Amino acid sequence: MSTKEKVRERVSFKEATTINNEIVVYNDDVNTFDHVIDTLIRVCDHTPEQAEQSSLIIHYNGKCTVKTDVYEKLKPQCIQLLAAGLSAEIV
């Protein structure tokens, strides 16, 4: 006789869908690297290194996820990024 251990993992629906949103910033021909870096530091609480790396990814790949969190926390940050002239959206 063999015994099999049955394991059930309970994951609540809220847990599974809580942090599925992210802010994506897109490349444009208008904003300078310095403006993008300063804005990411101010709005998204990036370190200077994070902001610089994100700006390079945005430039070379056309877009970069700069923040991941619940929608309610991302919405005001995305609005600030848009107000600063960056192309951004929550996905």
Task: Give short role names for the model-derived ranges.
Residues 1-91:
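Terminal domain-initiation and capping elements
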